[in-house]
Amino acid sequence: MFISLKDIVKKFKLNLRGVIHIGAHKGEELFSYYQNDVKNIILIEANKDLIQHLKFKKFIFNFFSLKIDIFNFAAYHDSLEKIDLFITSNTQSSSILKLKKHKELYPDIIETKKNSIPAKRVDEIFNKNLNIQNYNFINIDIQGAELQALKGCSKILNNIDAIYTEINFDELYENCTLVENLDNFLIKYGFIRVITDTPQHETWGDALYIKKPI
């Protein structure tokens, strides 16, 4: 996260009941969640090779009374038995979309293999044992597929107060979500972009969307 979660919580006076983290990778943000008193965390990661890392982190953070649930699927606007996941030499750049301008900007990062994985709507994981009322913040980092994933969250967005997401101003991945796509989709659910940060390159960065007061 380029933008400090502590600063976000303080500036927008957020009370984080729980986080839905889509594209959890190796759980790098878990300590930040702990520092900001987040007790309920959902980690969704498409790359099955990273799940053991997340399970180990869950074991460690259980000692700090964090409730962590781990899911291995690609967050998508529909539920499918199989979808392609393109694994890259830097696993943080892996995506369900193929590299495009990313190859020009970061030529050392290449696709190394393709996995066939399940895809699922995020709003389908909630039930009597996993209550959406315990979650009000989405953190999404899935390399250009943000709109597809957020469409699969549409049934729970009324419960969400803030969304932190990676954004693209150019096609780093083939047919990737551009920031204006996110703006136009999320405004329908009452979210406005309040912070934009592009510290590494002008074509991509992070953004924070907050639900505007009614």
Language-model-detected regions and their locations in the chain:
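Phosphate/nucleotide-binding beta-alpha loop and adjacent structural elements of enzyme active sites
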Residues: M1-I214
